Amino acid sequence: MGIASEALKNFKGFNLKSMPEVEPVSPGHRACQGCGEVLALRQAMKAIGTNTVVCSATGCMEIITSPYPQTAWRVPWIHVAFENAAAVVSGVEAAYKAMNRKKIIDQPGVTFIAYGGDGATADIGMQALSGALERGHNFVYFCFDNEAYMNTGIQRSSSTPFGASTTTSPAGSKSSGQATWKKNMAEIAVAHGTPYVATATPAYPIDLMNKVKKASLVPGPAYIHIYSPCPTGWRCGIDESIEVARLAVQSKVFPLYEVIDGEFHLSRKVAKPKPVSEYFKPQRRFRHLTEAEVQFIQDRVDVEYEKLVKKCVVEDKKKEKE
């Protein structure tokens, strides 16, 4: 039995009746209307609780929660550079470990969190994250993936999906938007031998919170890739964030799964998938795509999903009902 399996063998998850009341991230922040990322952040931090130290990369969640002299954070929180959240949390975790060992402090149960957007994770901060995972620091990393550099003007990242129009991959007469496929950061984390890796979305809050709680219980690094709708950048309605996130799962564009000690477990089997065209429809960043391009994307989604299913040693018995 691996270290994650051992840590989680008696795991008891959240449900609607046992939802924690604690709010480490307070209301009154400055997120855009309909922001899916801050909702995901709130859900994740409710699952973690208050005995934590958080290291935040520069990005949307840093900007909207910490305009000096105000803060939305009710826990120790450190703002660091775009690229080094994982490096900083490594140092914080090591410092706490040393101070506990030397009896300078008596705080053995602190959960160490680092987070960033897709740009800070998959691009600018990937080297620091890779190093932290390889060294085996005891921390949880959240990637809040809104599929572009939204904070600085909706520029494409390596997590921007194929065909999406951004300010640096604009659709036009000679371009169909983003020309490369989305980088699979969850599987990159798995390739590092990370004990616990998962995907989540705020459209399924209990699933997200249970995965975050599991990650916090595993000794060693854990990585959670959280799909985070951005109405501003995706050009969908401010009331459509959760519906778009749900459609991403139902269309197999963003599968929900977890990897425990290298074993893949599908969290939600999509028995009757919806076409990717239905997922694209609310988002004007995809409105330029032709039927042929949509079918091209559909074929790729189908292939990637089947690859994932074949990796899974256990599939959740629950079928997609929607």
Language-model segments: which ranges?
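Short, surface-exposed, charged loop/turn segments at secondary-structure junctions
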Residues: 155-162, 205, 212-219, 236-247
